[in-house]
Amino acid sequence: MLLDMIPNQLFRPAPVTARDKLLEAGVKLVREQGYAATSVDELCREAGVTKGAFFHHFASKEALGVALANYWSSSTGAFFAAAPFHHHPRAIDRVLGYVDLRIALLGGPPESFSCVAGTLVQENFRSSEAIRRACEDSIMGNARAIEADLAQALADAKVTSPTAASLSRHIQTVLQGAFILAKSQEAANSAEMARESLSHLRRYFELLFNVEKKEIEPCPE
């Protein structure tokens, strides 16, 4: 059952400080309406803090954007690091478990599952080098997190090409593309469109690694 693959924890703890409240507001608003359409006033209103508090923590809206990408990276990184798929003894099962977890997380409207770093970089890849770099670190860091399992799966299957690094980037390409496709759809169809893309990715891995048509073995307790 896919829901069994989701870690029993929130992506992020409830914010307590003004800074974290602003970052949480940033996650919500950037997902809903994008970075450019989100003003400092809106961020403060959503966070329930003053404008003075904003500029106490962030020198500019761009500084908030950089911090937001880093905040997203650290919180989602911890979430995926705690996921049950890591307990599979076989590397290919860990890889497929990661893809299955990604599929399980795709539900509701796009703003409930889309990537903050992906949204930020789409809007700012030429206008803000600082935000672009922070988003690169976020997206590529996510790719590197599964690279060792991919390398082991390739070795186990005696597959010499492509490389683990290339496959890890391909996963991110499919994910980010799925998020964009979902945003182009009516809300009722968006998650299903994204799941379809990830299902094709899973089938590609099954073919590449010569996986038999059977369910992944349950994770050991």
Model-derived regions: residue spans:
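N-terminal intrinsically disordered/low-complexity leader segments
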Residues: M1-T17, A157, V211-E221
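N-terminal positioning helix adjacent to the helix-turn-helix/winged-helix DNA-binding module
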Residues: F11, A18-A25, L167
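Amphipathic alpha-helical segments used for helix-helix packing
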Residues: D93-R94, G108-R133, I180
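Hydrophobic/aromatic-rich alpha-helical bundle segments in the mid-to-C-terminal region
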Residues: S112, S128-G141, L154-E221
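Short, basic, alpha-helical segments at the C-terminal edge of helix-turn-helix-like DNA-binding modules
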Residues: N70-G77
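Hydrophobic alpha-helical connector segments
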Residues: A67, A81-F113, L167-I171
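Helix-turn-helix
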Residues: K21, A25-A63, A67
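Secondary-structure edge/capping motif, primarily at the C-terminal ends of alpha-helices
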Residues: A83, H87, N124, A182-Q185
